[in-house]
Amino acid sequence: HHIEPLVTISHYEMPYALVEKYNGWEGRECIALFEKYCKVIFERYQHKVKYWLTFNEINSGTTKLGNVLSTSTVKGYTGPITQVPDSMQARYQALHHQFVASARVVKYAHEHYPQFKLGNMICFITSYPYTCRPEDILEAQHQMRNMNWYCSDVQVRGEYPYYAKKFW
């Protein structure tokens, strides 16, 4: 049927030892470890897989639930998922490390496996204004920008969007 696989390299999983040692993606060390992992799977599957995604729904890291799902910044936590402690600083530091890891892996793949096509994906969440009041419209735009465009701008354009400095 001429179906070709599309592999998502990281789909909400992180070895528990790395969560405990580095607090997941908050630890810069995870960048090199991800690169090493990707080099192994690229070599192993170079003749079977052409299409790759580096991270599943990377923008989930902008949310509190992203501590568990995407960035794995939950070192030492053993309670309910609904009560995960939240640190916006840790989440966005972890996201930055994922962006760097993704960029490095894409660069490596293009240099060593020109047949590969690498991309990214987000969990696009539409936000509608509650009313037609200007403040509700602006809030909906703000939610769309921070939830959807922030991560996709970095991954597609290779740089943080202009509003990121205001957000940080």
Say what each PLM segment does.
Residues 1-168:
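Non-catalytic scaffold segments within catalytic domains of secreted glycoside hydrolases
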